Amino acid sequence: GTDLPLCAEGRAQLEELKAKFQYPDVPLVFCSPMLRAQQTAEVLFPNAKLTILQDLREMNFGKFENRPITELVKDPEFAQWMDPTSRTNPDGAEDRKAFYDRTNVMLMKLFEYQLRTHTEEAACITHGGVIMNMMANHVLPQHKPEEWMTDPGCGYSLRLDAEMWMRDHIAEAFDIVPYGYLDGAEE
């Protein structure tokens, strides 16, 4: 995907979230190599060790990069590519199955690293498509990928039980990050 920096508006939104709500105090942040993800990590977790992982990058949209979603939803070729039953792969775009496999393997590696090193808390800064895919495939409660969509600067706290992970490759989502973000919000 296109490696754009965090825009001034995005940085201001993150600063506002950090001022209003609580982010967990974690020693380690796994992060996408994309510049905007690294800059997000610097704002939200300035004291954490940053570990850049290539497989946390967003899907490469190829010829659809940098086009507004309002335009893309009207494009029949984009709709066909997004259809889960389609094997269409537009020019320059990452194959959806390759993306699915890459992000699922990455989550497994992250969790196995945490279990092996006894890392009790860590954050992961990545992108919407990566989050939705990982959560839909390895997290309870089960939801469709689009139901795991988060607002910018937000995410989920997961509970990783070693036995459940080793047996089922499943973790449990138990809260929204930042803490307090949904308090008083209508569901």
Where are these regions (language model features)?
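Active-site-proximal alpha-helix that buttresses catalytic centers in soluble enzyme cores
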Residues: G1-A48
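Phosphate-handling substructures
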Residues: L4-P5, L44-R102
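Generic structural signal for well-ordered alpha-helical scaffold segments
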Residues: E15-A19, Y100, N104-L115
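Active-site catalytic microenvironments for nucleophilic, acid-base chemistry
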Residues: K20, V43, N47, K109, ...
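Generic beta-sheet signal
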Residues: P27, H118-G128
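Short beta-strand scaffold positions
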Residues: C31-S32, D101, I125-T126
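Short, active-site-adjacent cap segments at secondary-structure transitions
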Residues: R36-Q38, E58-M59, V130-M132
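Acidic, low-complexity terminal tails and accessory targeting/binding regions
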Residues: M59-T70, E112-E120, M135-E187
